[in-house]
Amino acid sequence: MPPRPRFDRRAPVRELPNINDRINYPKLRVVDADGTQLGVINREEALDVAKDRELDLVLVSEKADPPVCRIMDYGKFKFEQEKKAKEAKKKSHQTEVKEVKMRYKIDQHDYNVRIGQAVRFLKAGDKVKCTVIFRGREIQHTALAETLLRRMAKDLEEQAEIQQAPKREGRNMIMFLTPRKTPLIKTDKENQIPTRAVRTITAPPRATAAAKTQLNKDQ
């Protein structure tokens, strides 16, 4: 029986970018950092130009004849490429429906946990299906379940909008929330700063000259 292959615990070898001394072609077509064509020059000269500009010589088209290199800040270029890749991945995110389950008699701690789960799903761009599960005779308390779901929608109003209002589905009551596209602007009176009444104290009238003269005679 042949020996079983050993599990290779080593990290996979990453392919290193073709920049600077890792470029092994003797002749290169070089494009300067500002887009100027420097023409076909030998490798050593191209490296010297990049070094004088304190930049990198990067191979951008290996299949061309001769291969094409560009002088650039490779660190900045790599950062911008990774940023673009993340943005493209974010835009291509497929919306999923995540479910949050609970009972209508849920305690405050468990309710807070469900709220936290829903917030994470919504921030990831997914819809949330909120489900209240009934068991046995609990089906009689659909009104309490609806109240719970509407409370949940209220607590999540900054992150979500109601896509489907609470409704009974079999032995469950469900509600669908979708990520809010526009920020919520609160206009209720609770967010307004109350204006306190200020008591105005009227200063006493100033004494006239005649009154002052009479007062001096009396004294």
Swiss-Prot record:
This molecule's function is given as: IF-3 binds to the 30S ribosomal subunit and shifts the equilibrium between 70S ribosomes and their 50S and 30S subunits in favor of the free subunits, thus enhancing the availability of 30S subunits on which protein synthesis initiation begins.
Q: Which GO terms describe its cellular component?
A: cytosol; membrane
Q: Name one Pfam family in it.
A: IF3_C
Spell out where the chain crosses the membrane.
none
Top-level taxonomic group = Bacteria
**Keyword Cytoplasm carried by entry:** yes
Can the keyword Phosphoprotein be found in this entry's annotation?
A: no
Q: Subcellular location, in the record's words? A: Cytoplasm
Care to name a GO molecular-function term for this sequence? translation initiation factor activity
Report the main location listed first in the record: cytoplasm
Q: Which GO terms describe its biological process?
A: ribosome disassembly
Q: What is this protein called?
A: Translation initiation factor IF-3
**Similarity field:** Belongs to the IF-3 family.
Its subunit composition reads: Monomer.
Query: What are the protein's UniProt keywords?
Result: Cytoplasm, Initiation factor, Protein biosynthesis
